[in-house]
Each structure stands twice: as C-alpha cells, then as structure tokens.
C-alpha cells in the first residue's frame, strides 16, 4: 500500500522506495497514477474492500485498462475473458454480468487477481493471493502466477502465510515476525535448512511436519526492546531481551537476525 501511495494521509511512511531512479514515496500523485496499476500492480487480500458492489465485474476489469488510456474495447474485453479463464472461470460471460456480492469470497479473490494483471504490469505485489481458496484452486492460482512471473513481469513480490505458495513462486524469501525481518535468503535454502528459531518453528508447525506449536502464546502487552520473538523462542537468553539484534550473514549468503549467529 505504501509503495503505491494508497495509505491515508495520517499514515507514517519512512525511508525511500526507488523505482527507475524515482523515489515513489515522494512522487506527485499525477505521476504515480501513470505507474499505479500499469507498471506496478497490487493484488489485495480483501476483495470485498476493493471491488465495487454496485458495478458489474466485467466493467471493473476492463476499466483497469481504459483508465490508463487504452481505448481498444475489443482488446480489453478479450484480455478480461482470457484472465478469467486462466483463473478457473469456465463461463466468463456469467462472471462479467455478476456483481461482487453474488460471488463467493474465493471467486472474488480470483477476480481481483485477474484485475491486478489486466495491464500486464512489470511488477506485481500479490498480498495473500490464495486466501479463501480450496486446494484445487490454490494450485491453479500457483500456476497462473508462476507463468506470469516467468513470462510477463520483471518481478513479483508475494506477501503470504502460505509457505507452499512461497516455495512455488519465490526465488528469494524474507521471513518476518511482528514487522521485523528474521531471516532472508534463497527460498530453497531457507525452507530446507532454516536458521532462525522462528523459521524453524514456522516450518515445524506445518501439517506435514507435525503441526508443532511455536512456543507459548504471547500476551498482548508482553514485549521487550530486543528480539520480538524472544518470549516464544526455545533458545532465548538474556542477550535477546535488550537492544536491537544485529543482522548476521551466514556462509551461504543468508542474513539472520539472531544472537546465536552474531
């Protein structure tokens, strides 16, 4: 949301986000409109907040192209139907005539995914793109996003709790806990040989790995000035409590924020 300038005026945004030599955080709205949805697109995780309930789905999909100056209605209609089919809708005409409240949550999630790809953007930010989908539809979304990432885009940022999706789509992985990066590196290396205690716990909690809980539940007000994972970590020591934990680089190139590697 911050990358595309979609946060409210009261939001606090720090740092910079460079794209083609431009800092997107300081770009005028008129210039951002040329980038948003065309060069950098977002697939949001809450379609009910993104789809207009009083406008037909088909109109909202084609508008993604016309708002950026594409007046070729035939091309817009063709691409709309193409993406609906790719996301598992065998009858695009029925979906085009429907309103969002007439579709299930999973159907709306696939609609919003198609919407984000209508302009064939160079970069895609996919926020929980498989949310609300069953196993069959999740695999279909995997395939579509994988194809798009390999053929139509320069890159894709995937924000997800779905580790299988991350493993299927991402070359590199960042594992976050309470807003802090715990571990970052090549996806295959992290998933096969996790280093940070949180990453290890996350993978051990998967159904195929025993569904082991990640430590004890943390009380809402519980916290410290050090590692945010400290209250749940099985390897916690006093050094974890205070001060910012330094980032360490492992021999395989991974970066881990943990005193065990400092």
Question: Which stretches of residues belong to each language-model region?
Answer:
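Hydrophobic anchor residue at the start of the ABC signature
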Residues: 61, 113, 141
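Conserved ABC transporter NBD signature motif
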Residues: 12-23
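A short, proline-enriched helix->beta-strand linker immediately N-terminal to the Walker B motif
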Residues: 118-122
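ABC ATPase NBD coupling module
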Residues: 24-41, 67, 189-194, 223
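P-loop NTP-binding/switch modules centered on Walker-like glycine-rich loops
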Residues: 133-211
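Charged, flexible cofactor/metal-binding loops and thiol motifs
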Residues: 186-262
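Catalytic Walker B motif of ABC-type/P-loop ATPase nucleotide-binding domains
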Residues: 124-127
């Amino acid at each position: 949301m911050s990358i595309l300038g979609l946060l409210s005026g009261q939001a606090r945004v720090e740092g910079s986000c460079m794209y083609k030599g431009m800092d997107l955080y300081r770009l005028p709205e008129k210039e951002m409109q040329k980038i948003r949805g065309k060069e950098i697109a977002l697939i949001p995780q809450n379609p009910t907040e993104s789809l207009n309930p009083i406008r037909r789905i088909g109109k909202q999909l084609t508008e993604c192209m016309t708002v950026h100056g594409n007046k070729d209605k035939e091309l817009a209609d063709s691409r709309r139907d193409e993406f609906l089919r790719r996301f598992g809708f065998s009858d695009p005409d029925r979906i085009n005539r429907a309103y969002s409240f007439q579709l299930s949550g999973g159907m709306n999630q696939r609609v919003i995914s198609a919407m984000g790809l209508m302009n064939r953007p160079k970069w895609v930010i996919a926020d929980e793109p498989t949310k609300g989908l069953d196993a069959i539809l999740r695999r279909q979304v995997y395939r579509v996003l994988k194809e798009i990432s390999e053929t139509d885009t320069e890159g894709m940022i995937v924000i997800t709790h779905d580790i299988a999706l991350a493993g299927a789509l991402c070359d590199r992985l960042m594992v976050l806990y309470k807003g802090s990066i715990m571990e970052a590196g090549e996806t295959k290396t992290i998933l096969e040989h996790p280093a940070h205690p949180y990453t290890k716990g996350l993978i051990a909690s998967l159904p195929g790995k025993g569904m082991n809980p990640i430590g004890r539940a943390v009380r809402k007000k519980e916290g410290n000035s050090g590692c945010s994972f400290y209250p749940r970590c099985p390897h916690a020591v006093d050094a974890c409590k205070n001060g910012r934990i330094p980032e360490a680089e492992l021999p395989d190139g991974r970066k881990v924020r943990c005193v065990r590697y400092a």
